[in-house]
Amino acid sequence: MSSRGRLSERTDGSQHGAWVGCPRDHRAGSGTLGFVKFDNEFIVRKPKSEIAEVLAADATVTQLFPDTEIVSSKGATRETKTRVSALGVESIVRFVFHTEPDGSLRFEKICDGRVWRSLDGAIRLLPVNDKLTRVVIEMEGTTKALVPEFTIRAPMQSQLSQMTRALRERLERA
């Protein structure tokens, strides 16, 4: 159970919930915008401080998605580019990742306006006790008015699952 409702258990032990279809901000454009929100979480048998170190590493950011490279880095902020295939079209997507003082990692997509008006997320680290940390991955975004939520739901769920697997493997290995 999360603070937002029941989560379903997955075969890999992670939990997942998705809330979609709610208009977030009608001021951003005409018509109802497609608001999507996804989250996933898992527990790692390491203290938060160890996980925060791994999460802050460039190698972790580049392993979240295949074909990702860091194109600029300044302090706790990194910009990446990733080659992806979404909705049948090959393209390059750019994200900005920012490491927070508490060890969390915020990210946002640099939107080109073709599909997304906004896409933001975070990887939060919540200590369960001295030896366990809950890792929560959240993404939410608003699609353009002419992009129905159902066309983006499956690719987003797939990307979140891929990101969760890669992050979990990296955190458990380190």
Which positions does each model-derived feature cover?
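Intrinsic-disorder-associated, low-complexity terminal segments enriched in Asp/Asn/His/Tyr and depleted
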Residues: D12, D25-H26
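Hydrophobic ligand-binding cavity/cleft-lining segments
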Residues: G29-T77
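Hydrophobic/aromatic beta-strand elements that line small-molecule binding cavities or substrate pockets
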Residues: N40, T68, I92-H98, L119-P127
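A short, structured loop/turn motif at beta-sheet edges
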Residues: K48, S73, H98-D102, R124-R134
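Glycine-rich portal/gate segments that line the openings of hydrophobic small-molecule binding cavities
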Residues: T62-R114, R165-A174
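Beta-strand/loop substructures that line and gate deep hydrophobic ligand-binding cavities in soluble
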Residues: I110-Q162, E169
